[in-house]
Curated annotation (Swiss-Prot):
EC number annotated for this UniProt entry: 2.7.1.50
Keyword Plastid: no
Any GO BP annotation: thiamine biosynthetic process
GO MF, any single term: hydroxyethylthiazole kinase activity
Gene that specifies this protein: thiM
Keyword NADP: no
The name this protein goes by in its record: Hydroxyethylthiazole kinase
Keyword annotations from UniProtKB, A to Z: ATP-binding, Kinase, Magnesium, Metal-binding, Nucleotide-binding, Thiamine biosynthesis, Transferase
């Protein structure tokens, strides 16, 4: 599997997919820059009238519900509707959906307009959408992760999508299969927006290989986590330094290194 992940990672730079992002204002700059570091091209188009015209031109859509405004909500609905006829894949991060019911309603409305290819969240968010009890404090998960594989598979089957759960060990599931990703670093917990950035890198990979969305999702998360590991080894216990190095390490990461250093189980 690592061989295929390496090929997809290098393909991102070859294809330079256009990633249409509607994301939260806390992390929008970091998301744009991490997508650039991955080798893709970000476009932060949020005005509804513009989103409906732009979304069909994109390689992939990335919607993040972190600081959801009425204008963003309208843009997501317009964009998903307009892009559905072109089969543009959608990656959705349902930030805090377990504690803000309005976001669950929006997810259902988006699903009614077009398929969600990948749904990426923390443990509490994934369990909540799978119909299980998850513990959350605001946007952060307090869940231990017990039963996470089953929750991801349940959500993947229920909504016919790829479920990505981030935690101490990350899970990427579709229908009757899943992979565990063991790369990563605790320093991700000390910066704002690690999950948002991970979603952006996943979107870049799915945009480059939409026909292999499960492998592309694994590739994006694996690359982001490995870049984090490498950054942490140089940063010590300094989150500001770590954040800067994260962009640098992702930018220089190549498929051959991903194949050698990636730690997967499937």
């Amino acid at each position: 599997m690592l061989k295929y992940c390496a090929e997809i990672w290098d393909e991102v730079r070859n294809r330079r997919p256009l990633v249409h992002c509607i994301t939260n204002y806390v992390t929008v700059n970091d998301v744009a820059n991490i997508i650039l570091a991955a080798g893709a091209s970000p476009a932060m188009v949020e005005y509804p009238a513009e989103a409906s015209g732009f979304a069909p031109l994109a390689s992939v859509l990335y919607f993040n519900l972190g600081t959801l405004t009425g204008e963003q909500e309208a843009a997501m609905l317009e964009g998903r509707w307009a892009a559905a006829s072109r089969d543009v894949p959608l990656i959705l991060d349902p930030v805090a959906c377990g504690v803000i019911g309005r976001k669950v309603d929006l997810i259902e409305r988006i699903k009614s307009l077009g398929k969600i290819q990948v749904l990426k969240g923390n443990i509490a968010e994934i369990k909540s959408l799978a119909g299980l009890a998850g513990k959350a404090q605001g946007v952060d998960s307090l869940d231990t992760g017990e039963g996470l594989e089953e929750a991801c598979l349940q959500l993947a089957v229920k909504d016919k999508l790829i479920a990505v759960a981030t935690g101490e060990v990350d899970i990427v599931a579709e229908e009757n299969r899943y992979a565990r990703i063991f790369n990563g670093t605790p320093l991700f917990q000390n910066i704002t927006g690690a999950g948002c950035m991970a979603g952006g890198v996943i979107a870049a990979c799915v945009g480059a290989a939409p026909e292999e969305a499960w492998l592309a999702s694994i590739t994006g998360l694996l690359a982001f986590n490995l870049a984090g590991e490498r950054a942490a080894s140089q940063a010590g216990n300094r989150p500001g330094t770590f954040r800067t190095l994260l962009f640098d390490e992702l930018f220089v990461l190549r498929g051959e290194e991903l194949m050698k250093e990636g730690r997967l189980e499937w």
